[in-house]
Regions:
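Glycine-rich loop(s) and the adjacent beta-strand/alpha-helix scaffold that form part
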Residues: 153-199
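Glycine-rich FAD pyrophosphate-binding loop
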Residues: 4, 20-45
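Short beta-strand to alpha-helix junction loop
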Residues: 68-76, 95-115, 125, 163-167, ...
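Beta1/beta-strand and adjacent pyrophosphate-binding region of the FAD-binding site
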Residues: 1-11
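An anion/pyrophosphate-binding glycine-rich loop and adjacent beta-alpha core
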Residues: 34-36, 41-42, 50-57, 182-185, ...
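A conserved short coil-to-beta-strand element within the FAD-binding core of flavoproteins
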Residues: 126-139
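Glycine-rich active-site loop/strand segments that organize a redox cofactor
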Residues: 45-93
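Short hydrophobic core segments
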Residues: 4-6, 30, 130, 149-165, ...
Length: 300
């Protein structure tokens, strides 16, 4: 049985390894770019957060709430880590439940998958851009610029439009539409937030833990606690990724509020501030010892 897989990212490589276990299966993995796993190499700021041991129902959002339950029940995080361990990848789990390669390098994950593909019944084709796919009876005809390959089974794992600089295109959507599948409206998710506050560029690169809340028309919409990072045009970081998807889905006024001292009551904070106010300190130094220096100065 010949199995074709379009897309050499994380899903495509994993699919090729799984399919290769079938008796008499011959696998052809087709990738448009010059190398496999280009997006995977960049994920997690180059560290690759490949799972989360605390994955649960409350951590997922979308129009199909049952999908993640099915996926996690079929292949829970513990089994994912065991699968990677069998491939030779050692991992470390942070207190948050996030799992990273022990090397702390996303390229380690890519290399482990790439080395595992070196099997007699797996052929990898890079620089292979699929132009068209058609079904003729029980066979799938996959056409590239210079040739057509025929398969008994076909897996489309092209990935999405995210990360256009890393190769994200509409190609996968077009192939799926050619088979009659419908695509929902595309929206950004896991993205940074652009803000209108003029002082944000001065905090570029600063990281801090805080309570972040997003408001829609002055009403609390979603909140989370964790690390944020300031950019030259706004906010980034895990917490922002978690709440930003909502701001892309509706009109009206959206506001992001940050509390850098969520565990302190206002009364607890006022005493040291009043003491400093009565000293010879400059106003910009009032928050020294309480907040990151640059954040403190931006508040004054």
């Amino acid at each position: 049985m010949r199995i074709g897989i379009i897309g050499g990212g994380a899903a495509g490589m994993a699919a090729a390894l799984a399919a290769s276990e079938y008796k008499n299966a011959q696998i052809v993995l087709m990738e448009r770019q010059a190398r496999l796993g280009k997006k995977l190499s960049a994920t997690g700021n180059g560290r690759c957060n490949l799972s989360n041991l605390h994955a649960a129902q409350g951590g997922y959002h979308g129009d199909e709430p049952g999908f993640h339950e099915y996926a996690l029940s079929q292949y829970p995080p513990a089994e994912t880590l065991e699968w990677f361990r069998d491939l030779g990848l050692y991992t470390v789990t942070e207190a948050s439940g996030k799992v990273y390669p022990y090397s702390d390098q996303a390229n380690s994950v890519v290399d482990v998958l790439r080395f595992a593909l070196d099997r007699p019944n797996i052929e990898v084709l890079t620089d292979f851009e699929v132009m068209k796919v058609r079904k003729d009876g029980d066979a799938f005809h996959v056409t590239a610029k210079d040739r057509t390959l025929v398969f008994d089974k076909l897996i489309i794992a092209c990935g999405g439009l995210a990360g256009t600089k890393l190769g994200g295109t509409m190609a996968g959507y077009k192939l799926l539409r050619s088979f009659g599948h419908k695509c929902t409206k595309l929206r950004p998710t896991l993205v940074q937030v652009k803000t209108s506050w003029p002082g944000v560029s001065g905090l570029k690169g600063v990281r801090a833990n805080c309570h972040a809340a997003i408001y829609h028309n002055a009403k609390l919409h979603r909140e989370s606690v964790g690390e944020i990072q300031f950019t030259e045009f706004g906010l980034s970081g895990p917490v922002i990724y978690e709440i930003s998807r909502d701001a892309c889905q509706g009109s009206g006024e959206w506001e992001c509020r940050l509390d850098f001292l969520p565990d302190l009551r206002a009364s607890e904070l006022m005493r040291p501030l009043m003491m400093k106010r009565n000293s010879n300190l400059n106003a910009e130094d009032l928050f020294t010892g309480i907040l990151h220096n640059q954040i403190g100065r931006a508040h004054v």
